[in-house]
A protein has these predicted regions:
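Extended catalytic core of nucleotide-activated donor transferases of GT-like folds
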Residues: 10-13, 42-55, 64-114
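N-terminal subdomain of nucleotide-sugar transferases
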Residues: 1-65
Length: 114
C-alpha cells in the first residue's frame, strides 16, 4: 500500500540559504521551483528520502522548516490570509494540513514548536 510521507527538517548552517538566494536573485521562481533548485545543490539531507520513497511508489514531500524565505514563499502562494505576520511554526502547521501526510518524519529540528 502506498502512503504519503512528509519529512520536516532544518539545516544547521543557515548561511547556505543566503548564498543560494544570492544565486537566484534574478529568477522569479515559484516555491516548488525554488525548492527544486535548492535540493539540486544536495546540501545536508537534500531530498534523498523523497527520491527513494518515490521509487517505492510513495508520495513524498520535504519541508526545510528554518529556510525562512522558502517558507514565506509557500505561505504567499498557498494561504489566502495575511502571511507576512505568520511565523515558521504557523506556516508549517498550514503545510501539514495542506499535504495531509500519513507519516510525518521530523529530523534535526531544534527550532520547531508545534
Amino acid at each position: 500500500m502506498a502512503y504519503k510521507i512528509l519529512r520536516i527538517y532544518s539545516i544547521p548552517y543557515i548561511h547556505v540559504y543566503s548564498n543560494f538566494l544570492d544565486e537566484q536573485e534574478s529568477k522569479n521562481l515559484s516555491y516548488c521551483e525554488l525548492q527544486k533548485e535548492f535540493l539540486k545543490k544536495k546540501i545536508s539531507y537534500s531530498d534523498v528520502l523523497s527520491r527513494n520513497m518515490k521509487k517505492l511508489g510513495n508520495q513524498s514531500y520535504e519541508i526545510i522548516e528554518n529556510f525562512d524565505y522558502l517558507q514565506k514563499k509557500w505561505a504567499q502562494e498557498n494561504m489566502s490570509s495575511k502571511f507576512d505576520n505568520l511565523n515558521n511554526n504557523e506556516i508549517l502547521q498550514n503545510q501539514i494540513v495542506e499535504i495531509k501526510p500519513d507519516i510525518i518524519f521530523f529530523q534535526n529540528l531544534p527550532t520547531i514548536n508545534l
